[in-house]
Amino acid sequence: MNIVLVTATRKEIEPLLQYLTERIYLRKHQKVDIVTTGVGMMNTAYCLAKQFAQYRPTLAIQAGIAGTFHPIFAPGMVVSVKEDMIGDLGVMQNDQWLDLCDLGLAEPNTPPWKDKKLMNP
């Protein structure tokens, strides 16, 4: 099994890296690649496209803060994202946020969108 562990910055996963380093010998039939993408969607998309094209992982895991800071998510907490709203694609106009759908640049229910959200299948 080839696993890709994805993070924007290595600092986000330092405790996990220490854990894996100490125990990697237990994973003889599994390969774990660490991919540090840099912050932001464009960096992540570029790095993952390059990684996936070359190595074809069996499983990819996003680790780190995943672009969010919220007091209900304690450091080290594991979450599964069911849906996502992209806060980087849009504009502020008259003190109001307008997303791609509001601007007429995307349809709210045309894949990959559902009710203006990206759904995790």
Name the predicted role of every residue range.
Residues 12-13, 67-70:
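Short, active-site-adjacent cap segments at secondary-structure transitions
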Residues 56-61:
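Proline-aspartate-enriched helix->loop->beta-strand connector
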Residues 70-121:
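Mid-sequence, gly/pro-rich, charge-dense loop/helix-turn segments that line enzyme active sites
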